[in-house]
Amino acid sequence: MLSPKRTKFRKQQRGRMRGVATRGNKIAFGQFALQAQDCGWVTSRQIEASRRAMTRYVKRGGQIWIRIFPDKPVTMRPAETRMGSGKGNPEFWVAVVKPGRILFEMGGDEITEAIAKEAMRLAQYKLPVKTKFISLDEDLNKGNYKPAKTPVTADDSESSS
């Protein structure tokens, strides 16, 4: 399962999940993606279960990219422990997910939209956040990806005047 090799501090505060994802909210590697619709913590076990569900469905067909990483330690106290005596020990790792964040991407020559949709649906069941399936074509149509500006040539400037 995923976890950081080393961290600066062993324990973190729980924090708040406000707003939407400003980074990691566009498709970067594949043609299809699973995008979070609400906020939550996704544990390393849930990420691994989703990954296994997708890879088993697509077999050797395409490639899967995991776009989230569990870098936040969650501490827990032993059961039936009295209050006080410090913070508990780190038990598991979570990835903080905000709305709009891309969780998984999928692509490849043999991956059709139907195959990707079904594989992502199987992965959705393993996750604690509400998600939706998006494709690169939809994102291009929405205007999320702006093409690089083309330089104006001398021929273009003469014809416009």
Swiss-Prot record:
Protein's name in the database: Large ribosomal subunit protein uL16
Keyword RNA-binding: yes
GO biological processes: translation
Keyword annotations from UniProtKB, A to Z: Ribonucleoprotein, Ribosomal protein, RNA-binding, rRNA-binding, tRNA-binding
Pfam families documented for this protein: Ribosomal_L16
GO molecular function: rRNA binding; structural constituent of ribosome; tRNA binding
Annotated Gene Ontology cellular component terms: ribonucleoprotein complex; ribosome
Claim: Transit peptide is one of the keywords in the record: no
Organism of origin: Prochlorococcus marinus (strain NATL2A)
Cited InterPro entries: Ribosomal_uL16, Ribosomal_uL16_bact-type, Ribosomal_uL16_CS, Ribosomal_uL16_dom, Ribosomal_uL16_sf
